[in-house]
């Protein structure tokens, strides 16, 4: 629904640079079409968090996705996850990842993701390490750097 897309787009843009910026709602629609697993977190019927994940084999052109595509036969890639600033540190991130872990475990999939290291996203690095992710690589781009993680 357009309302949901608008809300997800806005939440994504409010979470940059921790989450990659989207060019447009059309860009968001394309990501959702490519995705295999999504989850919305609601509070009083308002979207306060979301996650968008892709499986191996989709036609996603992200360099970060390609890092895992070149190394793994199968995986669940967390393309983006965002929580509204006013709803952080309330357990929503843990709840989203518990759902993702259950989904991935059902299909025996490793979960792959990256976290920005330049500019540094220390809260996300700390969170993913607490959730059991292990660093498996890093990459420097012209305007940012990332660390790659698997669980």
Regions found by a protein language model. Give the residues of each.
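Conserved acetyl-CoA-binding loop-helix of GNAT-fold acetyltransferases
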Residues: 83, 89-102, 130
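Conserved active-site alpha-helix within GNAT-family acetyltransferase domains
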Residues: 118-137
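Conserved GNAT acetyl-CoA-binding A-motif
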Residues: 104-117
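A short helix-loop-beta-strand connector motif used in the catalytic cores of GNAT acetyltransferases and
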Residues: 30-40, 49, 54-58, 77
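A short beta-loop-alpha structural element at the N-terminal edge
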Residues: 1-8
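A short, internal acetyl-CoA/4′-phosphopantetheine-binding micro-motif in the GNAT/acyltransferase core
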Residues: 79-89, 117-118
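Active-site rim helix/loop that mediates acceptor-substrate recognition in acyltransferases
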Residues: 17-44
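Conserved acyl-donor/pantetheine-binding loop and adjacent beta-alpha core of acyl/acetyltransferases
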Residues: 52-80
